[in-house]
Design a protein with these regions (language model features):
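Rossmann-like dinucleotide-binding cores of NAD(P)H-dependent redox enzymes
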Residues: 20-67
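Cofactor-binding loop segments of dinucleotide-utilizing enzymes, especially the Rossmann-like FAD-
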Residues: 12, 35-38, 116, 157
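Rossmann-like NAD(P)H-binding beta-loop-alpha module
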Residues: 1-28
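FAD-site-proximal beta/loop scaffold in flavoenzymes
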Residues: 1-4, 88-162
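A structured beta-alpha segment of the ubiquitous adenosine-cofactor-binding alpha/beta core
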Residues: 62-108
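A conserved FAD-binding loop/helix module that cradles the flavin
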Residues: 19, 155-184
Length: 184
């Protein structure tokens, strides 16, 4: 229960947006969202971020948790400031900790809403020709959901990245129609 508490959510995706907005609805005293990149590089829906801001969520951009503060319970976080460096293998600018830049944030509850890096999908599926996006998800035709390999289709998180289950359900229905057409 977030009521009357200082909430800090770590992450920048749709799950983080669900957490911050739920905390607001539960009447949290304050809600902060820490993200290691800037707003333009946040993976979550821009609409969700805008809605969260309108509802009173404070975004702490270019920040990364360093350590939890508290005795027998969390009382806050020590946070490092981040600067964006050169692009990494995915093409996104790599977050780099700024030396001696830490600051503290008060928190009664800390929620980690962090995603995971995708695996090397071409290697995992034994097909080095399988195309992926700069995010590491499978690249598909927008209309048919077919990959660059004829007869190989994909749907859900493997093409979107971590997302909501309703999108996976929609994708599953759409790709079933495409597969049926392909087989006929």
């Amino acid at each position: 229960n977030a009521e009357g508490k200082n909430i800090v959510v770590i992450g920048g995706g749709d799950t983080a947006m669900d957490c911050v907005r739920t905390s607001i609805r539960q009447k949290a005293k304050s809600v902060k969202c820490l993200y290691r990149r800037d707003k333009e590089n946040m993976p979550g829906s821009a609409r969700e971020v805008a809605n969260a801001e309108e509802e009173g969520v404070e975004f702490v951009w270019l920040s990364s948790p360093k350590e939890f503060i508290g005795i027998n319970k969390v009382e806050g976080l020590m946070v490092d400031k981040i600067k964006l460096g050169e692009p990494d293998d995915s093409g996104r600018r790599k977050p780099e900790i700024q030396n001696n830049s830490h600051f503290n944030i008060k928190a009664d509850i800390v929620i980690k809403a962090l995603g995971f890096d995708p695996e090397n999908l071409p290697k995992l599926f034994g097909s080095e020709d399988l195309q992926v996006t700069k995010w590491g998800t499978l690249k598909t035709d927008f209309d048919t959901m077919e990959t660059n390999l004829p007869g190989v289709f994909a749907a859900g998180d493997i093409i979107r990245g971590a997302s909501l289950v309703v999108w996976a359900i929609k994708d599953g229905r759409d790709v079933a129609i495409s597969i049926k057409s392909f087989l006929e």
